[in-house]
């Protein structure tokens, strides 16, 4: 499978989606189902890191599938961080946010590296702890 899904930390607050090489819509759909299976037994909110630092161009139709995945996310989803420096992926993300999810610009962000993704989420989690 060109998309691997796993917990990124032992606290089970971050899911890591690792996109490798060329991947297909069917693999994206399977990964989304796997995320739902992982999160069905937890009672807290999660972040998702989409690690696209080592993948090729997204398949045709990904915006529609990403929209479906976003609509299915539910209450447990706190936000997503896309790790990539691929200009095409960044442009598609911008199109997705403008067309399907303009109100969620703060919930979906892009960074260049996995380190930046984890740093951003850690900062967001600290903010949540401070406000509760």
Where are these regions (language model features)?
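Amphipathic, Lys/Arg-enriched alpha-helical "gate/interface" segment within cytosolic domains
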Residues: 1-132
